[in-house]
Design a protein with these regions (language model features):
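Active-site environment of divalent metal-dependent phosphoester hydrolases
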Residues: 10-15, 39-41, 65-68, 107, ...
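Beta-strand-turn-beta hairpins that frame and shape the catalytic cleft
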Residues: 1-4, 107-113, 180-186
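Acidic, His/Gly-rich catalytic cores of divalent-metal-dependent hydrolytic chemistry
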Residues: 164-247
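Glycine-rich phosphate-binding loop signature in dinucleotide/nucleotide-binding domains
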Residues: 23-28, 108-109, 142-145, 181
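Active-site neighborhood of divalent metal-dependent phosphoester bond hydrolases
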Residues: 47-145
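Active-site neighborhood of phospho(di)ester-bond hydrolases with catalytic His/Asp-centered motifs
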Residues: 6-7, 31-36, 57-62, 115, ...
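Anionic-ligand binding region
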Residues: 133-177, 182-185
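N-terminal active-site segment of His-dependent metallophosphoesterases
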Residues: 1-56
Length: 247
């Protein structure tokens, strides 16, 4: 199966539309969304609806959790907290209910696992080799057949790899990764809607489960339109400004 794996869309419809156009030309058969479809951006419902129309697999990110329960936003900065309150007000009761029912983890096929921040914890961060080792240990206990897990939350493309008896290694991806026999992987596709790796393009990946191949994609989109919509919605200008910088 060929899958588009997306994370951290953050209500950025122009970015999501550009990514959709890109993966539509790549023979993608399914879409997996790793959470935080909402928050920060100005078009949460349109992004949720677009992914639903694609029959995407959804899991919850911390922004979905905050849209369900504002107490979950206690650790947000002022711009993020204002955006999630605005998002909550804009979404229908039915849509919020659907968000509240999303799982925090999911296995879409044997040997594959999805989570947002850390397994069972959408607010945790996976960004060190030490944390990577803990996640690999957790996944071994959960299901030793898991070969690759996809996660988001950091807004940065990243790969962790582990071979039994060897230390975990973390590295930034190139354009393509071939999954090596015997190795396990934790893979972050980067953010569609608010990259933080210094590259403002929309990031995602394409996973070919039969070939064991991952292609990392960076897609230009109309950043100016996304910024204009954020400002028109009355959200923080900082959320608009950062899009052009990829921070």
């Amino acid at each position: 199966m060929i899958v588009a794996v997306l994370a951290d869309v953050h209500a950025n419809l122009p970015a999501l539309e550009a990514v959709h156009a890109d993966f539509s030309a790549e023979g993608v058969q399914s879409v997996w969304s790793l959470g935080d479809t909402v928050g920060y951006g100005a078009e949460p419902f349109a992004c949720l609806q677009m992914l639903a129309d694609l029959d995407a697999v959804f899991i919850a990110g911390n922004h979905e959790q905050a849209a369900c329960d504002l107490a979950e936003a206690n650790g947000f900065n002022s711009a993020a907290a204002h955006a999630i309150r605005w998002t909550r007000d804009k979404l229908s009761t039915d849509t919020r209910t659907n968000l509240c029912e999303l799982p925090v983890n999911f296995s879409p096929q044997p040997g594959v696992f999805l989570f947002h921040g850390l397994p069972g914890n959408a607010t945790g961060y996976l960004r060190t080799e030490e944390t990577g080792q803990m996640v690999f240990d957790h996944l071994t206990d959960r299901d030793p057949r898991i070969r690759v897990a996809f996660f988001g939350h950091t807004h940065r493309p990243m790969i962790f790899t582990h071979l039994t008896g060897r230390p975990v290694r973390m590295f930034e991806p190139l354009e393509e990764l071939i999954l090596a026999p015997g190795r396990r992987y934790l893979v972050n596709p980067g953010s569609v809607g608010q990259p933080r790796n210094g590259d403002p393009n929309a990031h995602y990946l394409i996973y070919d489960s039969e070939e064991g191949r991952i292609k990392f994609r960076k897609v230009p989109y109309d950043i100016g339109t996304a910024q204009e919509r954020i400002l028109q919605a009355g959200l923080s200008p900082s959320l608009a400004a950062r899009l052009s910088q990829g921070i």
